[in-house]
Design a protein with these regions (language model features):
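Helix N-cap motif at beta-to-alpha junctions
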Residues: 136-142
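Active-site-proximal betaalpha loop/short-helix elements
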Residues: 53-129
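Active-site glycine-rich loop that binds ribose-phosphate moieties when present
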Residues: 1-12, 48-67
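Acidic, Ser/Thr/Pro-rich beta/coil linker or hinge segments at domain junctions
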Residues: 150-200
Length: 200
């Protein structure tokens, strides 16, 4: 493990850097559900919501984020992928050798993602989230503004810390990130039979 001064001198993040997240969690997982379970979802939700979920596919590239990161003093960047935002936060902290303090309420979400995940009893924080990126930066708000200027919503969701703890805070409640779990989307592969109880 690198000491804080070594991380700075080698261009790696020290404690106190902003953790920035782009777009919204659960984009790809929700798009897949909307495409593969369209008829079922239309029986429960308005067509406009299902079409919106299918349209999340257009957000899956993170090339613009990468281009901005390269000129904005970003020390680390990672695509949010399988296992969702929780898995990617863990993996990025491991790569960077830092702890994390994340405010759960600041993680960007879309209500469509939440409602579709709730329908299938899936955790939206642990579902395939390609299209979103995590970045460590000294000037988090400035990075968010630079991303907004090219049409990419972003938010500071926490900061890096010394030590190994990966803390998720939800109001006064504190929890610690677990090791990454299998992606929630995998549940759907064996879920169809159970959905009979929901009127499939």
């Amino acid at each position: 493990r690198l000491e804080a001064a070594d991380r700075v001198s080698r261009g790696l993040p020290a404690a106190g850097q902003a953790v920035v997240m782009t777009k919204w969690m659960g984009l790809e997982g929700t798009a897949i559900l909307a495409q593969e379970k369209e008829a079922q979802l239309l029986a429960r939700f308005p067509r406009v919501m299902v079409e919106k979920a299918k349209g999340f596919e257009k957000y899956l590239s993170i090339l613009p984020e990468a281009a901005t990161a390269g000129k904005s003093g970003v020390s680390f960047m990672q695509a949010v992928r399988e296992g969702g935002i929780f898995a990617s936060l863990w993996e990025l902290a491991e790569r960077a050798g830092v702890g994390l303090h994340i405010d759960l309420m600041k993680i960007p979400m879309d209500q469509t993602v939440v409602e579709i995940c709730n329908y299938y009893d899936l955790n939206p924080y642990e579902i395939l989230s390609s299209g979103s990126a995590l970045l460590f930066a000294k000037q988090g708000q400035q990075l968010c503004e630079e991303l907004a200027a090219i049409g990419i919503p972003a938010a500071v969701i926490g900061q890096t810390t010394d030590g190994n703890d990966r803390i998720i805070q939800n109001g006064e409640e504190i929890r610690y990130l677990d090791l990454p779990k299998p992606d929630q989307i995998r549940k759907i592969l064996n879920y169809s039979a159970k959905m009979a109880n929901k009127g499939e």
